[in-house]
Amino acid sequence: MKIKFLGTGSGQTSLKRSHSSILISSSKFNLLVDCGDGISRAFLNQKIDFQSIDFILISHFHADHFTGLPALLTQMKLVSKKTNLTIFVHISEKNFLEQFLFHSYLFKERMTFEVKIISFETESEIKMDNSFFFIARRNSHLDKYKQYDPDKRLGFVSLSFFFRDDENSVIYTGDIASEKDLYLFDQKVEWFISESTHIEPQYFADILTKLNPDKLILTHISDENKGSLLSFQQNMSKSLKSRIFFASDGFDLKHCDTGCL
């Protein structure tokens, strides 16, 4: 498994970072996790082929995590992509996504490739092939908004993920809201990827000791919180400091050997 960070910014637009997107590659497919605003430009900047994406997985429907999707599909059409594209989304959001793409004038009949939208439930093991699967669990990132939807029209689903193949295992928190959301999965993994905007830095040291991942990679970094993250790292013990990395756009996890904030 290889992981490339296409977008490592927060919800606040930055000239230095694109919005959230992670590319997970195996020997058989490419999976894009989230596709925030500006993802198509991020593809060009990092020389990613629009035709190379086989699957897209959406963690939640905040704008910085999904609004780049229509533009990305448009670029795929313009380069005459032929291979199928499957978009994975929580079951509560499937109808919305179908309507969103329809209202973006992305009609299936006019695409050069087949677009499938597949819904899934939390806790289900979703197999991408014989050696790769993911499990999604719901976190509390969107819970604070429930008071604004008395008619319960929205699902308020924000997901964290566990990925595994024959070589590697990964936890990706997605956007979260509390320390508890860091522990939705308790598996020992090589790579623990966490957002860093909605959680205090001191909790990351606990992750390194309690869950003991080989590497902790922080993303979803705003221009404002970069300094506090660096200060946090500088105050860590040498043994822990060597295991924490700050992702920047283009960060290749498979070959990382130094922090690159």
Each language-model region and where it sits:
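DG-centered beta-turn motif at the end of beta-strands
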Residues: 173-175
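Conserved short-loop catalytic and cofactor-binding motifs
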Residues: 10, 149, 192, 220-221
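Binuclear metal-ion centers of metallo-dependent hydrolases, dominated by the metallo-beta-lactamase
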Residues: 177-191, 199-261
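Binuclear metal-dependent hydrolase catalytic cores
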Residues: 1-171, 230-261
